[in-house]
Amino acid sequence: MAQITKAHHTGISVRSLRESTKFYKELLGFEEVFTWNPQAEYIGVLTGYKDVNLNATILKMPGVDVFLELLEYGNVDLKDIDHGNANPGIAHISFFGDDVDEWYRELTEKGVKSVSAPVTPTIGPNKGGRAIYMIDPDGVRVELIQSSKSFGEYKGE
């Protein structure tokens, strides 16, 4: 059977490429790799939107090979979706940070909304750390975690 060999990127559909790029670059520290307008027949076939006008920005998390692809779809009827954590689909994306409380202060001062104030997990791999769900310009939950362990290091309670 074929196997997945590693993660490539996470794609997020956005209403405004400019606004979302600013959020991830200026507020979360991602670096812009490139912006492009990929126009080819296979794009329409792959996405299921024959006449799509796609604009994309590729962002990189500093110091690691973690990439976000922000996608703005043109020539397509856009529909808002409810990004609530319990709804089917992508619930959130998550990143480690060195000071969740400072992130919260800085981001809320700049008008970024959150689901709650930072919390201290009492169970699981992030026990004793700090966590927060911030909300990006399109309603996507962005979890910031301050913890000494990753999922791969967790051995259970």
Residue ranges and their predicted role:
Residues 14-18, 64-65, 72-138:
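Vicinal oxygen chelate
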Residues 70-72, 146:
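Residue-level recognition of conserved beta-strand positions in structured domain cores
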Residues 79-80, 143-145:
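Aromatic/pi-system hotspot detector in well-structured domains
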Residues 24, 107-108, 155:
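Short, flexible helix/strand-to-coil boundary loops that buttress conserved ligand/catalytic motifs
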Residues 13-65, 125-127, 133:
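Core segments of cupin and vicinal oxygen chelate
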Residues 1-21, 36, 42-49, 90-95, ...:
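N-terminal beta-strand motif that seeds the catalytic metal site of vicinal oxygen chelate
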Residues 67, 141-144:
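Short glycine-/small-residue motifs
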